[in-house]
A protein has these predicted regions:
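Basic helix-turn-helix/winged-helix DNA-binding cores
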Residues: 1-71
């Protein structure tokens, strides 16, 4: 299973690291797993969530609405 470091995920999703941190801190994406080296690793599924967030934002949804949608689906 593929995993991304924070910088790799940010680049793949065309976001900056601060945005990933914001999304993580606000519950839009699950927290990264930390390895013994202290690096944060995200599973590949996180990229799918980020792509959905991007599409939903482009469609006019707020981050609050997106978070509520994710909560309803879980």
């Amino acid at each position: 299973m593929k995993h991304y470091l924070r910088g790799q995920l940010a680049k793949a999703a065309r976001l900056n690291k601060e945005t990933l941190r914001y999304y993580e801190n606000n519950g839009l994406i699950p927290p990264a797993q930390r390895d013994s080296n202290g690096y944060r690793y995200y599973p590949a599924e996180t990229l799918v969530l980020l792509e959905f967030i991007s599409v939903a934002k482009a469609a006019g949804f707020t981050l609050k609405e997106i978070k509520e949608l994710f909560s309803a689906l879980r």
